[in-house]
A protein has these predicted regions:
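Conserved N-terminal segment of class I S-adenosyl-L-methionine
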Residues: 2-150, 288, 294, 309-330
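A short, aliphatic-rich alpha-helical micro-motif
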Residues: 92-93, 156, 178
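Short conserved AdoMet
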Residues: 137, 172, 186
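A short acidic, Gly/Pro-enriched loop at the edge of an enzyme's catalytic core
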Residues: 150-161
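A short SAM/SAH-binding and catalytic strip from SAM-dependent methyltransferases
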Residues: 160-172
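A short glycine-rich, Lys/Arg-flanked "PGG" loop and its adjoining helix->strand segment in the class I
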Residues: 175-187
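Conserved class I S-adenosyl-L-methionine
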Residues: 190-233
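Substrate-binding/catalytic lobe of Class I Rossmann-like enzymes that use SAM or dcSAM, i.e.
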Residues: 219-292, 296-302
């Protein structure tokens, strides 16, 4: 792994004002304030806080098992990444210091690391970050860190680009997570966000979400996965026999077919990806569906220089926001 310079790292227990220093042993860092030492193993620097809320721990465990059971890279994942980050493209990462907040198994880390970044911090609280470290061990600019996104162990104004895809809505306090992302972003930097939308997901909020909260999220992921196989296979058949042909694999809008924009989009995916999508929607204890007015209110508090919303597949929000440059007041 690429060990980051200690002046960019902060103690997750003491907060942003507590910069770490190089530890006495190799590949370790220490907090001069509390005396805690942090080490690396398996290519991952461990900067997890001493205490994490139990609901967060359970969500992390469920997701970690989900990602670890779907350990693979595929070419279509890069297209999906670029769709989620549009209009920000590959060149926006070149020569920049980047934070990937919530990297999971590293399916996006692998691509960002190949875009010529100056440095990439890929953070995740789950054990899946160990897989991300293996995927990116050939990239000297990538640092994989096990950390809590509600206490990002980076200094203020330390990254040029922050990317958080499909993760903010799984935090116990999504607004606090957004503030943390904004804190570490440099003035003039860019935040790219993708979250579940409340708009367009009424049937999920009304029918699927209660099932997740009351039942499926309480079943360990390793047991839940085989139980969901009939549902996953039924969805896969519907995608291949109906949604794919009718929508031309997501290229043609169809108003009469329910949830057509999203299901047409994922109709091109293989079964293992569809099965993973089903599992990801039903395994986590924490999941929020965020409305545009809610997100606009949160961003208004941050006073960005610019921010742009895009309704992706009519069921999720992509947000690109620029932090005001130093001395600039909107």
């Amino acid at each position: 792994m690429a060990l980051p310079p200690p002046d960019l790292l902060t103690c997750p227990d003491c907060g942003p004002g507590a910069a770490l220093s190089t530890g006495a042993a190799a590949e370790t860092f220490a907090c001069p304030r509390c005396g805690r030492t942090f080490g690396a193993g398996g290519g991952v620097l461990d900067l997890v806080p001493k205490s994490v809320p139990s609901l967060t721990e359970e969500t992390v465990r469920q997701f970690g098992d989900s990602w670890s059971s779907h350990e693979y890279l595929a070419p279509y994942q890069e297209k999906q990444f670029l769709d989620w980050t549009a209009p920000v493209g590959r060149e926006a990462f070149r020569g920049r210091t980047v934070l990937e907040a919530g990297c999971g198994k590293g399916r996006h880390t692998f691509h960002i690391g190949g875009y010529g970044v100056q440095r990439l911090f890929s953070l995740d609280l789950s054990d899946a970050v160990l897989i991300a470290a293996q995927y990116t061990k050939a990239f000297p600019a990538v640092s994989c860190i096990r950390a809590d996104l509600l206490r990002i162990p980076l200094a203020d104004d330390s990254v040029d680009v922050a990317v958080c895809l499909g993760v903010l809505h799984h935090l116990q306090d999504p607004q606090a997570g957004l503030r943390e992302l904004w804190r570490v972003l440099k003035p003039g930097g860019t935040l790219v966000l993708w979250v579940y939308a409340r708009e367009g997901n009424g049937w999920i909020v009304a029918l699927v979400d209660p099932l997740r909260k009351g039942l499926t999220s309480r079943i360990p992921t390793k047991l839940l996965r085989p139980l969901l196989l009939p549902l996953s296979f039924s969805l896969f058949l519907a995608l291949k026999l109906l949604y794919g042909p009718v929508t031309r694999r997501g290229e043609r809008p169809v108003g009469w077919l329910p949830y057509a924009a999203y299901l047409g989009y994922i109709s091109k995916f293989p079964f293992r990806e569809v099965e993973h999508i089903v599992l990801d929607h039903l395994c986590p204890p924490i999941a929020y569906y965020l409305s545009r007015p809610t997100l606009e209110g949160w961003f208004a508090e941050l006073k960005p220089a610019t921010f742009e919303f895009r309704w992706h597949n009519r069921n999720s929000w992509n947000v690109v926001a620029e932090k005001a440059a130093a001395g600039r007041h909107e």
